[in-house]
Amino acid sequence: MNNMRILIAIVLLAFCIAIVPARAERVYLDITAQDVRKVVVAVPWFSSPSAPAGDEKEGKPMADLLSQGLAFHGFIQVVDSQKYGGRNDADWKALGVDYVVMSKFETAGSGMTIEGRLLDVREDKMMAGRRYRGESKQSEDMVLRLCDSMIEEFTGTPGISRSRVAYVSDGTGRKEVYVADALGRGHRQVTKHQHLVVSPRFSPDGNYLAYSSYHTGNQNLYLTDLRQSKVTNAVSRRKGMNLAPAWSPDGKTMIVTLSKDGSPDLYLIDREGQVKERLTSGAAINVSASWSPDGNSIVFVSDRSGTPQVYLMDLKSRNAQRLTFEGKENSEPTWSPKGDLIAFSSLRNGQYHIYTMNPANPKSVQQVSSGWGDCEAPTWSPDGKQIAFSRRGQGKKQIWVMLKDGREMRLLYNVKGNQSYPQWTKAVD
């Protein structure tokens, strides 16, 4: 595996050991605070023995990628390197810079070493340093590992620039599943059924993708090993609906909607498709389950009250309680990996928007998306700080992303066709 060739054990540089205080003493940025200003960061072009500081050809592409990764997290403003020529000896205070990422690289044969240091301009001291070794063709991956480690220095949580998003696109004329990283690199087609595909869902380890396809005329459930894209297995081909797989936190089971016995209901199945338990029953439609991170509860959608609403079920008692009471319909709930919030889409005043709620307090509902179009199918970033969703309007459906409170809403991918059903997962080493 290529990533295994990178020495991902981060090397703390010698100078850091002496000057960086113990992590317990660190004070991290709260990027969720409404009144927090963006951190201003400069990213000079990478230097190397063969490419002096300020050399645009060798060092600029890596600095540009690092800048893109840092800015993606929503709380960093990267200074345009043209303002200081990409050099690492500018007057940072005059430029209003808070921090500088000083980076360099060195090649030896087919190998490469990348090193980055974080300078606190106000304190005039180095906060941290990281070094990565790998093959030259892995330079982008190493740069993004550096990015995610710098984000961790700011927030206490590793960054997500290497995380991945699955989505459905009709760019080829048929709706198929694609996967790309969060920065829009490496879009690749996963399915080739040449028929409608919906509801892609990553396994917790990020190695498998479950989805539903209509290519046989029935809505069947499939599982693809992303490490070997040609390895696809049918999990459930039961007559009727086999829809919306929701992986358990341990990755051993899924909750799916099956209509084999009449009304669409939630069933617990194993990875081979064997039914372990039926979770709902009755005349109502029950769909779109999402597990709590601790595996003790699920949220799901049911029309048992007459319209689609979000419900919470305790998996031990099987008791279900209604969570949503406003809006014509509420659907597609998804539980934050932190466990504190669920996001869902709600139809109000003729328009779909994304809302969040603390499931322990149904009155805590907040609208987080805004503006034109219908916003649907929310999915959480692996760190629980951002939400991606499908936005329909202006003649097209695309994937957008925002901070969990609705700030920094922007287009995620600008690719051919219409995109829907986003699903976010962590990076895989």
PLM region spans:
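Hydrophobic beta-strand positions that form the internal "hydrophobic ladder"
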Residues: 165, 206-209, 251-255, 295-299, ...
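A flexible loop/linker signature enriched in serine peptidases of the S9 family
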Residues: 158, 169-176, 192-195, 212-221, ...
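Blade-level signature of beta-propeller repeat domains, shared across WD40, Kelch, NHL, RCC1
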Residues: 394-429
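Short beta-strand->alpha-helix linker/helix-N-cap micro-motif
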Residues: 30-95, 101, 105-107
